[in-house]
Amino acid sequence: MAKEILFNIEARDQLKKGVDALANAVKVTLGPKGRNVIIEKKFGAPHITKDGVTVAKEIELTDAYQNTGAQLVKEVASKTGDDAGDGTTTATVLAQAIIAEGLKNVTAGASPMDIKRGIDKAVAKVVDSIKHQAEKVGDNYDKIEQVATVSANNDPVIGKLIADAMRKVSKDGVITIEEAKGTDTTIGVVEGMQFDRGYLSAYFVTNTEKMECEMEKPYILIYDKKISNLKDFLPILEPAVQSGRPLLVIAEDVDSEALTTLVVNRLRSQLKICAVKAPGFGDRRKEMLEDIAVLTGGVAVLYVGAASEVEMKEKKDRVDDALRATRAAIEEGIVAGGGVAYIRAIESLDGLKGENDDETTGIAIIKRAIEEPLRQIVANAGKEGAVVVQKVSEGKGDFGYNARTDVYENMHAAGVVDPAKVTRVALENAASIAGMFLTTECVIVEKKEDKPEMPMGAPGMGGMGGMM
């Protein structure tokens, strides 16, 4: 396939058009007064969402160069969603801001590599500041409720549901999301756990009438790799045999030799054992094995109800965002929300200098870029960003602007908090992709081939009758 190549300013300009197209569509969703985006679907009703990564994933541009730029920022949103569960829109806004500021300086003749080094130094300082600002959540379910509420687009009902679910199965418990039959959103707690896998051999069956393997108070061995040699497992198998308790083995797979050995032991020594293949695939499998490992008080199921299918999808997106953000908050703590944590981190950059002028420029780019989430939240609320940023910058600690109520107040006290992990990961991913963008000198894309139109048939060639 033939390729097209663009270099230097021309290449970066085309990439930036793609970045802006995607980022402008995503950033309208940021903050409590962020707007919805309607996505056309080829089949079924349109999808209405306020989830940044959902919007990003739907965007494909016709121009190959611009589409390459859009895909770079899409990667920022996706990776942030995967790593932290939320903050996809914030990461997109930050990436766009760093790219825009950086591109001005690179075009003016600054060294892209030195600017990238300055950006990396500044990001490391901001991350340290976020870690120092973070406040641990612990078992404080009120704080958990605050995080869930903010992440669910300031829906207190969803926030309370997630906090209640965590109270019932502990903050490390398993919580799943399903569609309700009616319009109400409720919580159900299922004792134990269910996954879609069965025994690997019929010889493990204990109830031949029902063809089921039933065990009481078994030891459970969870292994995230393939079992191919049972010698390594003998130290685990022997205590199980001596205790007389059954043993359930959940592994990625068990090869035929190891499975035969288990079956022979089951038949000869009456060892109560059963081997099961782990549920899920790839990263999802690892998550599910972790869920099984921490299973304590059963599984909480959030049944999401809505009046229509369109509303159901949108609400389910928000519940999923809120749940994942809550997990992130439990992991690394919470910071003041509404972009305030970034504003407070600017102070940590005041004394930071680069090894040369271009590195110092890179530090200044981050100083300016981390104001952008607050500016965008304010813009989406219909106010003037520069004025609010100035006033919040003059404040101390958790003082910030609550866009939902249009009031300047203590963000922690008002319940406007973000998970520290989300705040950190959003900046790290945005800076990583922006740095790659600024140091790009050449873009190669596939050349579109003009497909010739089908030739028209000559007169008199409509059928076979004219043939001799």
Which residues are covered by each model-predicted region?
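Extended, low-charge hydrophobic alpha-helical regions
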Residues: F7, E60, Q66-N67, V299-M468
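Amphipathic alpha-helical transducer elements in NTP-driven molecular machines
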Residues: N8, R12, K16-A23, Q66, ...
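Residue-level signature of catalytic and energy-coupling elements of molecular machines
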Residues: L15, G31, G85, G109, ...
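Conserved phosphate/anionic-ligand binding catalytic regions in large, soluble enzymes, centered on
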Residues: V26-N36, T80-A95, N154-E179, E331-A345, ...
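N-terminal, positively charged regions that mediate nucleic acid binding
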Residues: M1-F43, M461-M468
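Glycine-rich oxoanion-binding loops at beta->alpha junctions
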Residues: A45-G81, L200-M211, P218, I222-P235
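Long, structured protein-protein interaction/assembly regions in large complexes
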Residues: V127-E332, A336, K448-P455, G460-G463
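Short, ordered loop/turn segments at secondary-structure junctions
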Residues: K41-G44, V53, E60, A95-I99, ...
